[in-house]
């Protein structure tokens, strides 16, 4: 990932209001940030932000009341040595939290080395938690996919397929049935955790749905506030096809998945044909996926019944004609 745009200035601008940050000194170092190696070697955002640590270089160092108190109890020689080691690590910036006064020697060294120094009245723990969440978001893997992203029965569903198959019309039908629109045409996905991908709408396309013959529709204005969603976790991909290809299976023996940002996402394929109620089919696919997530697999249950019937043809099953 390109980390050139992530620097002290951008982080300060994005978090100044939330964390009540003040830029004390080191303004010349506004371009300081993380190296690509540092980000690549980090297993999580916890490796990029933390309490004062002289072992891990190139990380955001937060000095709370405990660190300042420890500093005050050191001898002048130890204070000078610790401050020199801290600045030598070349952190993107330093934060003095908890409303504590920044030590004069720290301010002086930050000024001389152009190391940004922020202060905040918030506790060190709160600052670290907030910055870790922020870093995990901006450094998370991202992708933009084409389709209509909807909230159907509380599940994030992406409608995909070739142009002209009626994805937007299907989305409009589902919205009229009480489901919610997240994004149309271009959907921004980001992997925020080890087991989920979140989808949002680009700001330019917020609340808009393009339908051929009608143009752009403002779904929020037409259907109301409850017809749109800010974000949803992607759980199912519904691919619309005009006609089955050679790989299309009417009764697939294994669940289909699509890799999205390194995670396997469940997928179903629905053929578009005259007379087919696609909205009902999509809702049924969503309900079936919900059952599968709960451990209920209808196809596997049927195969188990079939296997038992083949092993014992004379066995009695509910509903068997005799």
From Swiss-Prot:
This is HPr kinase/phosphorylase. PANTHER family: HPR KINASE_PHOSPHORYLASE (PTHR30305:SF1), PROTEIN YJDM-RELATED (PTHR30305). SUPFAM superfamilies: HprK N-terminal domain-like (SSF75138), PEP carboxykinase-like (SSF53795). Residues 209-218 are annotated as: Important for the catalytic mechanism of both phosphorylation and dephosphorylation. Gene3D superfamilies: HprK N-terminal domain-like, P-loop containing nucleotide triphosphate hydrolases. It holds the Pfam family Hpr_kinase_C. It catalyses: [HPr protein]-L-serine + ATP = [HPr protein]-O-phospho-L-serine + ADP + H(+); [HPr protein]-O-phospho-L-serine + phosphate + H(+) = [HPr protein]-L-serine + diphosphate. One of its GO terms (biological process) is regulation of carbohydrate metabolic process. It comes from the Bacteria.
